[in-house]
Amino acid sequence: MDYIGAVQGIPVCFDAKECRADTFPLQNVHEHQIDFMGKFERQGGVSFLLIYYTERDELYYMRYRQIKKFWDRGMQGGRKSFRYDELEPDWTMQLKNGYFVPYLDYIQKDLDLRD
């Protein structure tokens, strides 16, 4: 994990990834990371991946439940990757000023969907 801590009083853990192509191989996420994120979520925390698609110059906030869905599919013999077109468009972040990452807005959005 790239960050484990509290953001505005909310327990948060995330890992940042980079992808050049529109297909993200699940081998870029390790089993121990999925396990840790799951435990963190069960204890009331917010876990997610930030995936930067370099060719698109887009950043994607992937909620734990989404990465877990793709992970489980791979473990059950399905695709060991996910495609860009499988992502939920509402979780694509627009970079501000070319570098600012507005992840706090997406943490709040994630929390709002849990209530």
Predicted regions and their residues:
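Charged, low-complexity, helix/coiled-coil-prone segments
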Residues: 15-17, 46-50, 111-115
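Conserved catalytic cores of phosphodiester-cleaving nucleases, focusing on short active-site segments
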Residues: 3-21
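Nucleic-acid nuclease catalytic cores
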Residues: 38-68
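Short acidic/glycine-rich loop or secondary-structure boundary segments that cap or lie
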Residues: 13, 22-25, 58-59
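Mg2+/Mn2+-dependent nuclease catalytic core
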Residues: 17-43
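Non-catalytic C-terminal interaction segments of nucleic acid-processing enzymes
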Residues: 1, 60-115
